[in-house]
A protein has these predicted regions:
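Eukaryotic protein kinase
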Residues: 1-260
Length: 260
């Protein structure tokens, strides 16, 4: 897929301005909504991926799941468009003027107070999603954006699961990022709100320590979550924060907090 900055306006409405990021699934652009005269972010799906029904279904699901949720910590989705001719499928969302949490962690461990604030915001967004029957399934620093005022935004509901909907992946397919995956997911149990809370606890652990607890191949990391205890957090982490992380990352989902 290659779209130049002087490409035609998408859907007669969204003018692309500059590339924000690109990856295996496509790219995200800063754009302008010419109808409402406001800045937006536009996610473009790679045109070659539009030939795969599962990928298109997942892209639509991201739009549907996020558009039905309203919370300050959830990036708003405004519009969706199918591929048409040489134009790719696209998703229009709130433009977040800030980096992913991964960029902050790359500078080193974060203060406990800052981590608690981030976790509280994400938990609030997850509570709304879970109440609506939506489980994110891929909470990780790369899917959490921090704007200039310190507000956290949950993004990428592309692998989310909504209660009552048909699954978008084959049985036995592991969905999520191994470094943040709950132990019960490894044993084939379905994702639930407690799975998101485990992932959130792993995000908090990484923020406080500056690194993920387990490394290796995807399978080695996944098995470590199921079989090993987390390495101790730095001694500078307050005991009550340490206990919170322990609660969120309990191996048995029944021992995690009952809700976000």
């Amino acid at each position: 897929m290659s779209l130049s900055l002087n490409a035609e306006v998408l859907a007669s409405r969204y003018q692309l301005e500059s590339l924000i990021a690109s990856g295996g699934m496509g790219s995200v652009w800063r754009a302008v909504d010419l109808v409402l005269d406001r800045p937006v972010a536009v996610k473009l799906l790679r045109t070659e991926l539009a030939q795969h029904p599962d990928t298109i279904a997942r892209f639509r699901a991201e739009a549907r799941h996020a558009a039905g949720l309203s919370h300050p910590a959830i990036a708003q989705v405004y519009d969706f468009g199918d591929a048409s001719g040489d134009k790719p499928a696209f998703l229009v969302m709130e433009l977040i003027d800030g980096p992913p949490l991964t960029d902050l962690i790359a500078r080193g461990a974060l203060p406990a107070a800052e981590v608690l604030d981030i976790i509280a915001q994400v938990a609030g967004g997850l509570a709304v999603a879970h109440a609506a029957g939506v489980v994110h399934r891929d909470i990780k620093p790369g899917n959490l954006l921090i704007d200039r005022s310190g507000l956290v935004k949950i993004t990428d509901f592309g692998v989310a699961y909504a209660a009552g909907s048909a699954p978008l992946t084959r049985t036995g397919t592991l969905i999520g990022t191994p470094a943040y995956l709950a132990p019960e997911r490894i044993s084939g149990q379905p994702a639930g709100p407690a799975s998101d809370l485990y992932s959130l606890g792993m995000v908090a652990y990484e923020c406080l320590s500056g690194q993920v607890p387990f490394t290796g191949t995807a399978m080695e990391i996944a098995l470590a979550h199921r079989l090993q205890s987390l390495p101790p957090l730095p001694s500078s982490v307050p005991p009550e924060v340490d206990r919170l992380i322990s609660d969120l990352t309990a191996r048995d989902p029944a021992y995690r907090p009952p809700s976000a």
